[in-house]
A protein has these predicted regions:
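Amphipathic alpha-helical dimerization/coiled-coil segments
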Residues: 4-37
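Conserved G1/Walker A P-loop phosphate-binding module
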Residues: 38-116, 120-124
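Conserved glycine(s) of the Walker
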Residues: 57, 197, 289
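Conserved, well-folded catalytic cores of nucleic-acid-processing
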Residues: 68, 87-91, 106, 121-128, ...
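Conserved C-terminal guanine-recognition region of P-loop GTPase G domains, centered on the G4
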Residues: 92, 116-186
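Active-site glycine-centered loops adjacent to acidic/histidine catalytic or metal-binding residues
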Residues: 99, 161, 191
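Canonical P-loop GTPase G-domain recognition
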Residues: 155, 164-222
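P-loop NTP-binding site
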Residues: 226-334
């Protein structure tokens, strides 16, 4: 007999009414009596790995739980190439959410490294969250990931994400399909984009954590190095403005960070492409594309750095960079 969830959190009729207003991302708070320690002084902390197919909405979910942007988001596969840790802290708990690259079959050294990150993070986690995209049918990829999670034997839960795109009937069908994956634990219908269902999910994840002290300062939201954070924000704007093979074929590297006398920051960055034709697309007619990428990226960099940022952005070609082990090391994709 297959295991079934103890319950489907939030599946009452009141849950559907909650979509009328929705919750702003990061606006939720757990009541004191919902916290595991209940004000007793006991704390819980640990790592929760988020696993799922590409485009399941893992990064959006991490941002919703943390209450701010720590992982870039786009509708392109391979948006997440590095292990991203988002940190959410309450009065007596701390969740370290590990946003893993989407599980896929490795095709080159880049994707081999991405899948290696998945395997290592699952082995080191305290709990695992399987994230399913409600806009995708449950398929072989989801079953493969569910088996991998069962094999590590950690406390687990399942999220059916993007339920704001579904009516009640399709959501209930998705929850049933999630239960058929044989995962232990609860299934949570969630809209990470709107924040609906996030408080119930957080409360449950906290209860899966071991007792222990906080792993990071309470005000820290991510442990990514500054250069990587800035490069990711530039890459996000590149992904949002390109199509077809270009998003898969670009990476961003920060060459230099230069402190200016007026307190602003000058960022020297380059976009790596694999072919001259991709470089032409990224530059655009009269330089319009790279200018648009740079303008949008500067706004994000200003917010991230908390000060004025100047961006010197160039586009370069490095054929076969996804197979260049030295460059992958330098980019921090390990």
């Amino acid at each position: 007999m297959r295991p079934t969830p103890a319950r489907c959190s939030g599946c009452s009729s009141g849950y559907w009414r909650s979509f009328d207003s929705g919750l702003a991302v990061g606006s939720w708070q757990l009541a004191e009596n919902d916290l595991v320690g209940g004000g007793s002084g006991m704390t819980r902390s640990g790592f929760v790995a988020l696993a799922g197919r590409p485009n399941a909405g893992k990064s959006t979910l991490v941002n919703a739980i943390v209450g701010g942007k720590v992982a870039i988001v786009s509708d392109k596969p391979q948006t997440t190439r590095r292990e991203i840790r988002g940190i959410a802290t309450g009065d007596d708990w701390q969740l370290v959410l590990v946003d893993l690259p989407g599980v896929q079959r490795p095709r080159d050294p880049l994707t081999e490294r991405m899948q290696g990150q998945v395997e290592r993070s699952l082995a080191d986690a305290d709990a695992v969250l399987l994230v399913l995209g409600g806009d995708q049918r449950v398929g072989p990829g989801d079953r493969f990931i569910a088996r991998a999670i069962r094999n590590v034997g950690l406390p687990a839960a399942t999220v059916l994400n993007k339920v704001d795109l579904l009516d009640e009937g399709r959501t209930l069908a998705g929850l049933a399909a999630a239960a058929d994956l044989g995962m232990e634990g609860e299934v949570f219908p969630v809209s990470a984009r709107r924040g609906t269902g996030v408080p119930e999910l957080v409360e449950h994840l906290v209860r899966l954590l071991p007792e222990g002290p906080f792993l990071y300062p309470p005000d820290e939201r991510s442990d990514l190095p500054e250069r990587v954070r800035l490069a990711e924000l530039i890459r996000e704007q590149t992904l949002l403005r390109t199509r077809e093979e270009v998003p898969h074929s670009v990476e961003v590297e920060i060459d230099e960070l230069e402190e200016r006398d007026d307190g602003s920051l000058l960022v020297h960055a380059r976009i790596w492409a694999e072919t001259e034709s991709q470089k032409g697309i990224l530059i655009g007619a009269g330089g319009r594309m790279v200018k648009a990428i740079g303008t949008a990226a500067r706004r994000e960099l200003d917010r991230e750095a908390g000060r004025r940022v100047h961006l010197d952005l160039t586009v370069r070609v490095r054929k076969g960079w996804r197979r260049d082990e030295g460059l992958l090391d330098r980019l921090g994709i390990d």
